[in-house]
Amino acid sequence: MAVALAGARSPGAGAILSLRRLAPAAAAPVRLGGSGTPGTRRRRGIAMAAAASAPPAPADALPKGADSFFRTVISNMEKVYLSRNPTAKTILELVRSYDGDHICYDHFAFRTFGVDGYGIKSLAEFFTDFGYVPREELRFPAKKLRALWFSPPTNDGYTGTGVYGPLPRIFISELLVDELSPQSQDIIQKYIRTSGKGNKHATLASTSGELTWEKPIYSDFQVLSRESEYAAWTLVNGYALNHTTISTHRLISDIRSINKFNKFVEDNGFKLNSEGGILKVSPDGLLQQSSTVADSALFTFADGITESIPRSYIEFAERLVLPQFKDLPNDEVNEHHRRDGFEVGNADKIFESTSNDQLTRRSA
């Protein structure tokens, strides 16, 4: 994943974070808007696994026309992402060359400002309109973030790959703007005010790669960078895809093992996010993730200053078979037999893929 950018440096293991499991929408509605306390939910303790209890049933498969339209939209999001991030584009090409055309996406991830309707809700409503189901909230107190992930509608039977294969999970995070310093809050609010009703067209912004607010000045970017690298990233990238994630276990060659996949990536000259170790593993051992360091690109700010900014990265995830299905023959194992959801501890470290520490290490 997850994931992505980063605010304050990751806290130690003892300081980490909390995750609350949300009840299925029919039983307890999920609040998608802005920052603050989410809707009704059951407390599940720290960093609990997503697969700990029965998930809500997925929505029915989309009608043919809706499915085609939805895939065209996410394909356009992907095109913007690949045009700006040569690392992701090259790795996808290398995997296809080595493994054949078997790439499936585990999830897509986005970053938002959790204020005045520009947070999770601004993107979520598009996905829920097309059958996605809100699942769990994750909290990252040190980074002043919350996130919500969404499971796709039923999409069995798709034999395509990439955006034309099984639909990805969606992971949307938001910065809790009202927890920042007054100076940073003022900067973010200043740009939000120039957006008009841009939050209502977040999906369009993601497919076009355009900001819905005025292009920022460099000094504002610098101020946000000092307090929250996530805030600075979002200011200059807006609703663009933060990362896509290859589902390694859906590949067919030896690199379906994430450890071999990581070696494959490094052997081809790419640096992986080293925060907390190259491989991020959930406490149950069933969700294993890694990611590249974000690409950088020159950006000309509104005041004419041109500087390098972080763009996006690509993640890799292997979801292992749940214990109750461990005796299933390999050819009978489907995605619902594997570990689902996300893990706060993993995602917290994946967020660091756009941090200055990782970017500096990449260029070293």
UniProtKB/Swiss-Prot annotation:
UniProt-listed Enzyme Commission number(s): 1.13.11.93
Deleted gene: phenotype: Reduced grain filling rate, reduced grain weight, reduced seed thickness, opaque periphery of grain endosperm and defect in starch accumulation in the periphery of the endosperm during seed development, due to lysine accumulation.
Enzyme class: oxidoreductase
CDD domains (UniProt xref): VOC_like
Primary location: plastid
Cofactor entry: Fe(2+)
Function: Catalyzes the decarboxylation and hydroxylation of 2-oxoadipate (2OA) to form D-2-hydroxyglutarate (D-2-HGA). Is involved in a D-lysine catabolic pathway. Involved in the regulation of starch synthesis and amyloplast development within the peripheral endosperm during the grain-filling stage.
Listed name of the protein: 2-oxoadipate dioxygenase/decarboxylase, chloroplastic/amyloplastic
Gene: FLO7
